[in-house]
Amino acid sequence: MSTGIETAGVPDAVIPELVIISGMSGAGRSTAAKCLEDLGWFVVDNLPPALIPTMVELGARSQGNVARIAVVVDVRGRRFFDNLRESLADLESKNVTRRIVFLESSDEALVRRFESVRRPHPLQGDGRIVDGIDAERELLRELRGDADLVIDTSSLNVHELRAKMDAQFAGDEEPELRATVMSFGFKYGLPVDADLVVDMRFLPNPHWVPELRPFTGLNEEVSAYVFNQPGAKEFLDRYAELLRLIAAGYRREGKRYVTIAVGCTGGKHRSVATSEKLAARLAAEGVETVVVHRDMGRE
């Protein structure tokens, strides 16, 4: 069946899935969008509703590179709402499948959230926060009625909302975890984005071995020296097992990214060799892993 989306001259055109995220300000639209992004969706924030059909057409022309599109729609005025209705009707006439996810919360929860960040509601004008909430709720009433999925976030924290989104959109796949393993030198300071820190200074320093000093932990002889030290292999085995446990917990909590910082004195020998070994272990467990040697070559 033809979809009506213009894909002339594009072989194997695939019409992307489309999810439209909308709802009350402060109800968790950004969190829902970030969850879909982490699940591999192409997310566009605050796209004018009139451009949604164009976005779908561009996705269809990507030859499968953009197979799932999520658009966050912030309806702040009647004209935007009318444009959204027109775009949805246009997509429906072209047989494009779309889902609307609507995020809502109680007045009390929304007031509490706006007060906690000390920001006004975008529609309150010179009135109170609750006035803005009332205006937005009335403006979105019809869209809420058209929603395929309504999520009330009044009593949900960020992790619980992510779990609900995962349940709807992750399918049977376990959420992926992406790890950055970063070697560093303590004398240059801790990485500010580290979630976990490993200190390899309990092992002898190859710096004091003249024939190894010029090389880095990427060198096979340096790596062999490090992991032939007493306790080195046992540490690697035990820490890899600990990471397996931590990774499972991160997935349950909806955490998608983790940075493991592995340090030694200068970030040249022990930390580099260990980072490479840990990254290989993580990759073997199915964790998408990137290795960064922050301070190598800095001395």
Swiss-Prot record:
Q: Name one GO molecular function term.
A: GTP binding
Keywords, comma-separated and alphabetical: ATP-binding, GTP-binding, Nucleotide-binding
Which residues does the annotation say bind GTP?
A: 74-77
InterPro entries (UniProt xref): P-loop_NTPase, RapZ-like, RapZ-like_N, RapZ_C
Q: Name one Pfam family in it.
A: RapZ-like_N
Provide the binding site for ATP: 23-30
Tell me its family: Belongs to the RapZ-like family.
PANTHER family from the xrefs?
RNASE ADAPTER PROTEIN RAPZ
**Function according to Swiss-Prot or TrEMBL:** Displays ATPase and GTPase activities.
What name goes with this protein?
Nucleotide-binding protein SAV_6292
Instruction: Write down the species.
Output: Streptomyces avermitilis (strain ATCC 31267 / DSM 46492 / JCM 5070 / NBRC 14893 / NCIMB 12804 / NRRL 8165 / MA-4680)
